[in-house]
């Protein structure tokens, strides 16, 4: 029975697991959309949501402590700046639910269930091609 088991282990040591989840969180915040396996996407969702909420709270209070807290958690000052500067403004009126998980079939090599995890309300840039045929 799996009573009181909070997180997935992914067959890794705890240091490797935390490093992997941290890298996935940083990639998601940086690119705003990543493709990964479904269990990994489900596992990083609460971490990313908490990071965005921390950025929102400390942006409103205008405290330096918030940026230091984010840097201590994610070890990347550029991502902390993006959380406080861009994402906290984008999600100012939203109370949670900053991410979306879309199932994306199965991986060809090992049939692992794949998913796309993305930040909602993101700017989608479209490139129009000039066809003069």
From Swiss-Prot:
Highest taxon of the lineage: Bacteria
GO cellular component: cytosolic large ribosomal subunit
Molecular functions (GO terms): structural constituent of ribosome
Keyword Cell inner membrane attached: no
Pfam families: Ribosomal_L17
Disulfide bonds: none
Any single biological process term in GO: translation
Keyword DNA-binding on entry: no
Keywords: Ribonucleoprotein, Ribosomal protein
Subunit comment: Part of the 50S ribosomal subunit. Contacts protein L32.
Sequence similarity: Belongs to the bacterial ribosomal protein bL17 family.
Protein name, UniProt field: Large ribosomal subunit protein bL17
Organism: Ehrlichia chaffeensis (strain ATCC CRL-10679 / Arkansas)
């Amino acid at each position: 029975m799996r009573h009181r088991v909070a997180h997935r282990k992914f067959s890794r040591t705890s240091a490797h697991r935390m490093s992997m989840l941290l890298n996935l969180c940083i990639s998601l915040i940086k690119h705003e959309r990543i493709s990964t396996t479904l269990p990994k996407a489900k596992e990083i969702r609460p971490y990313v949501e908490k990071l965005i909420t921390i950025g929102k709270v400390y942006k409103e209070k205008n405290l330096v402590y918030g940026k230091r807290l984010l840097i201590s958690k994610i070890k990347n000052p550029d991502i902390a700046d993006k959380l406080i500067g861009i994402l906290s403004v984008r999600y100012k009126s939203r109370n949670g639910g900053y991410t979306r998980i879309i199932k994306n079939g199965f991986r060809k090599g090992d049939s692992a269930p794949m998913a796309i995890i993305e930040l909602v309300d993101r700017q989608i840039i479209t490139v129009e091609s000039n066809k003069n045929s």
